[in-house]
Structure formats: structure tokens, C-alpha cells
A protein has these predicted regions:
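Extended, charged helical/alpha-beta scaffold domains that provide interaction surfaces
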Residues: 1-191
Length: 191
């Protein structure tokens, strides 16, 4: 029963988000939030404030982020070099990402892109959620098989499930971001 409670809490969160998409809510602000989160996640994953800017691995950041968000090659500004704060780089890349998406919007009629956002979000959410359910089942079986000594298996399940849920959320954000930046306009030419 406690295992089911964990699953139900996660299900409620996902179904609430899914319902927003299905109800036809304008998802643009949510999508922009996902894009900003994706940028921040990749930057913080690759670059640490503990290193001076000249040691930041921009090649790795370019390799990780640019296939998802097609920005220009990432180089540090003079201000970022002097501040040494990763947050400054994150803020600039987030601004550039939003500007790039606003440029992408001009390729579409407004209602068309809003519908594309909904379709992509729904497909990604559904696929990632189904994968997550399978992963949670495997986790439950694995925790049941392991001896946790003095640890409560339900607590371990909740903690691992929370981490997996966060990973799924990041994957939804990243895949949605990449799909929206790479969607193409096709025009039929009538003869």
C-alpha cells in the first residue's frame, strides 16, 4: 500500500500536467520554462563555479547542449570571464535560447506552433511516463529482493522513486526542447 501511495503521488503530478496540455492551455510559458531548465541543467552538469572560467569545459558544453538547442558555438563573454560565475553564463544562454525560440515562432502561424507544442509535449509525456512506470515496477521488485539491513524498503523506494521521477521530468524537458527546435515547416507545392 505504501508503494502504491508513492506511485499515486507521481501519477497525480503527471496527470495534472497532461490535463493542462489536453485542455488546450497555452503551453508557451511552460515550454519556455522547460527550455531554460534544459539549458541550466546542461551547464551545471558540465561546468562548476569552483573552477576559474578559463578551465570551464566549453567544448563539452557545446557537445552536450548544441544538439538540443541550436545556439551558436558557446564562448565566454568578457563579463562572464571576469565574474567567474556560472550563473551569468546560464542567464545569457537562457536569454539566447528564448530569443532563438521566438525566432523559430516566426516560421509558423501562432496557433500552429501552439498546437505543435501540445502534440509534442503529449507524446513525450506519455512515452516517458510509461517508461517511468516500468522503471518503478523494476525498482519495486529490486528493493523487495534486496536486504536493506536497518533501512525501511518503503523509504528507499520513495527516495529512489523521487530521483527517478526528477530524471524523467528532466528528460521530458530536454526531449521536448530538442523536438521543438528541430521541427520543420513543410509546404506543399500545388501544380
Amino acid at each position: 500500500l505504501d508503494y502504491d501511495r508513492v506511485n499515486n503521488e507521481q501519477r497525480e503530478v503527471m496527470y495534472k500536467e497532461r490535463r493542462r496540455v489536453l485542455d488546450g492551455d497555452d503551453m508557451k510559458e511552460s515550454v519556455l520554462g522547460m527550455m531554460k531548465e534544459t539549458v541550466a541543467n546542461h551547464v551545471y552538469q558540465v561546468i562548476s563555479d569552483e573552477l576559474p572560467p578559463e578551465e570551464w569545459d566549453l567544448a563539452a558544453l557545446n557537445a552536450e547542449l548544441l544538439p538540443i538547442v541550436p545556439l551558436n558555438k558557446i564562448v565566454l563573454t568578457d563579463a562572464e570571464k571576469s565574474s567567474g560565475k556560472v550563473d551569468d553564463l546560464v542567464a545569457r544562454l537562457q536569454e539566447e535560447t528564448v530569443a532563438l525560440y521566438e525566432q523559430k515562432e516566426k516560421e509558423f502561424e501562432d496557433f500552429v506552433l501552439r498546437e505543435i507544442e501540445r502534440i509534442i509535449l503529449l507524446k513525450v509525456i506519455d512515452r516517458k511516463w510509461m517508461d517511468h512506470i516500468d522503471d518503478m515496477d523494476q525498482l519495486r521488485e529490486g528493493i523487495g529482493l534486496q536486504a536493506y539491513g536497518q533501512r525501511d524498503p518503503v523509504v528507499e523506494y520513495r527516495m529512489a522513486g523521487f530521483e527517478m521521477f526528477n530524471d524523467m521530468t528532466k528528460a521530458i524537458q530536454e526531449e521536448t526542447t530538442g523536438a521543438l527546435f528541430h521541427v520543420q515547416v513543410e509546404q506543399k507545392i500545388e501544380r
